A protein has these predicted regions:
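Membrane-interface helix-loop junctions and terminal tails of multi-pass membrane proteins
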Residues: 1-215
Length: 215
C-alpha cells in the first residue's frame, strides 16, 4: 500500500521488479478513489462549512479543508525541514518493517507484527504529526492531492500555498527515507543475522539444481 516501501523492498528485499510499477499505480489509484469516496459522502458538509466561514475553494484559507485529503506542513517549518521529517520517520518505519519480516532476527512474528507496526505509526503520528502530518506514504498523499486539485482546490492543493510546490516533500521524502532505512538495516543489522536476504532466490536455485541433478 506504500510506494516507498515497495521501492525499498525491491532494492533490498528481492521484491519482483516487474511488480513495482503496477503496485505503485494501484496504490495511487486506490488513494485517489478513497479521497473521491470521502468527498462524495461528506459533500454537503464541505459545502456548508465553506458557506458558513466564507471560504473560497482554491484559496490559501481553503487548505484546512484540503488537509482532510492529504498532508500539509506546519506553517512554521520550511521545505527542507519538512523533507527531513518525512525522510527520517519513513526510514524508522522501514527499518521496523524489515526487522519484523526478517527470518533471522527472532522477533515475534504472525499477528503481532501488524500490531507493532501500527503502534509505531501511532507513536510517529503523536510525536511528528504536528510538523508535516506524517505522510510516510507517497500514494496516500499524492493520490488525494490529485483528487483535491480536480475537485476545485486546483493548484493550491499541490503547492500548499508555498513557493516550492509542497507535494514534492511527501512524494519523494518517504521514498528517500525508506531506501535509507532499508539500507541501514541491511548494512548494520541484517548482515550480522544468520539469514540471507534473498531466501526466495535461494529456494528457486536449490530447486533448479535438484531438478537438473535428477535429469
Amino acid at each position: 500500500l506504500n510506494p516507498a516501501v515497495t521501492i525499498a523492498l525491491w532494492l533490498f528485499a528481492c521484491f519482483d521488479k516487474r511488480k513495482v510499477v503496477p503496485f505503485i499505480i494501484s496504490q495511487v489509484a486506490g488513494a485517489f478513489c478513497a479521497a473521491a469516496l470521502v468527498y462524495g459522502l461528506y459533500y454537503n458538509l464541505f459545502v456548508d462549512f465553506e458557506q458558513t466561514h466564507h471560504i473560497v475553494r482554491g484559496s490559501v484559507e481553503s487548505l484546512d479543508l484540503a488537509g482532510i485529503f492529504s498532508t500539509y506542513p506546519n506553517p512554521h517549518i520550511n521545505f527542507v525541514q519538512a523533507f527531513a521529517v518525512e525522510m527520517v520517520i519513513t526510514a524508522i518505519l522501514m527499518g521496523l518493517i524489515l526487522a519484523l519480516t526478517d527470518d533471522g532476527n527472532g522477533v515475534p512474528r504472525g499477528p503481532l507484527a501488524p500490531l507493532l507496526i501500527g503502534l509505531l505509526i501511532a507513536v510517529i503520528g503523536a510525536s511528528m504529526g504536528p510538523l508535516t502530518g506524517f505522510a510516510m506514504n507517497p500514494a496516500r498523499d499524492f493520490g488525494p492531492k490529485m483528487f483535491a486539485g480536480l475537485a476545485g482546490w486546483g493548484e493550491i492543493a499541490f503547492t500548499g500555498g508555498r513557493d516550492i510546490p509542497y507535494f514534492l516533500v511527501p512524494l519523494f521524502g518517504p521514498i528517500v527515507g525508506a531506501i535509507l532505512g532499508a539500507f541501514a538495516y541491511r548494512k548494520f543489522i541484517g548482515r550480522h543475522l544468520p539469514c540471507d536476504i534473498c531466501v526466495v532466490e535461494e529456494k528457486d536455485s536449490t530447486a533448479a539444481t535438484q531438478q537438473n541433478a535428477s535429469l
